[in-house]
A protein has these predicted regions:
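Transmembrane helical cores of multi-pass ion-transport proteins
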Residues: 1-338
Length: 338
């Protein structure tokens, strides 16, 4: 359901959304809410909830309420960005662990850890070196290709994408959620739909604002609300979990020089192509290469200037910035902003 959502939401929002270059798909912040619903009522209720979530988001766009995100104060934005960077950084530590026979996780053996750290270092070095040589080839892709080549042709034993999960599958098919269409069902899904719609729009519109700052252009918030809503309605009918803007992936896209709709649409289409035809190749990519890419994203996302000015700004602003960062790390991005 996550891969289908990544394809459908990614394609629809890249073509019709209000922020060219932004990448959307299934996200962890939405999944946290969805897990509770699925455990209690089943996957079919999730699909109907995603459809209702999309309707709510489209209503926000139609009523032109997307502008409310511009009321978020600058210290909150700084705290959000720094908290995001910390969340991405901490999330990578799971890749340094291995699951034992009893299901518990422990750190990799020292030899495996050294290999992984070395590969991460090579990935990061390539990413920083490539822009000095050429700007016509995405540095993140170059890093992944170089390290994948080293691992595959060097016969290095390290964790790959395929060791964690399979990404192969087929085309999504249209279907009406198999749940009773009555008031009881509505009372079950309505609270979840409102929460998911709020989280999705907050993350998406904050990402729009973030990219606005990077590109020094202005996105269309109401159009993004309409696009996110339409994408979620569609993915609900095709058995997807819904989605919103993916901040980390959007930052990678921006750092790679993408500025137009083609990048997002191509990413979604390539994801589907990989699922259908090239899953075996993707599964051979070392996890270390992906971790290296994300570490570079962390370095580029964190507002290092905020550390220099924190003693110069009003105490209230500094407190808000630190609080938002802390809540972002402890809970999720949407709750921190609220």
């Amino acid at each position: 359901v996550g891969l289908y959502a990544a394809f459908i939401v990614g394609l629809v929002t890249s073509v019709t959304g209000g922020r060219p270059g932004m990448i959307s798909g299934a996200t962890g912040a939405l999944a946290v809410v969805m897990v509770v619903l699925v455990k209690e009522h089943g996957i079919e209720y999730l699909f109907l909830t995603v459809i209702l979530m999309g309707i709510i988001q489209m209503a926000v766009g139609a009523l032109k309420q997307g502008r409310l995100i511009r009321m978020v104060p600058y210290p909150v934005m700084l705290g959000f960005v720094n908290g995001l960077a910390i969340v991405i950084f901490l999330a990578q530590f799971e890749s340094f662990k291995v699951e034992g026979a009893n299901g518990s996780k422990s750190w990799l053996p020292s030899s495996d850890l050294a290999i992984m750290l070395g590969l991460i270092g090579i990935t990061m070095a390539v990413i920083y070196l490539i822009p000095k040589l050429t700007t016509k080839f995405p540095s993140a892709l170059a890093g992944i290709l170089v390290v994948s080549g080293i691992v595959i042709f060097g016969g290095i034993n390290t964790t790959s994408v395929g060791d964690l999960s399979s990404i192969s599958g087929g085309l999504p098919s249209f279907g009406i959620p198999d749940v009773p269409m009555n008031m009881e069902t509505l009372m079950i899904i309505l609270p979840h739909a409102f929460i998911l719609a709020a989280i999705g729009l907050i993350e998406s519109l904050l990402t729009v604002s973030l990219i606005d700052g990077i590109t020094e252009t202005k996105g269309q918030n109401n159009r993004e609300c309409l696009s996110q809503g339409a994408a979620n309605i569609l993915t609900g009918f095709f058995g997807g979990m819904g989605g919103c803007a993916m901040i980390g992936q959007s930052m990678i896209n921006m750092k790679s020089g993408a500025r137009w709709r083609l990048s997002g649409a191509l990413a979604a289409l390539l994801l589907l192509a990989y699922i259908l035809f090239a899953s075996s190749l993707i599964e051979r990519i070392p996890i270390a290469a992906l971790v290296g890419v994300m570490f570079v994203v962390v370095i580029g996302t964190f507002s290092w200037s905020s550390l220099r000015i924190i003693r110069k700004v009003p105490v209230a602003d500094a407190f808000v910035m630190i609080l938002v960062s802390a809540v972002t790390v402890a809970t999720d991005l949407a709750i921190a902003v609220i």
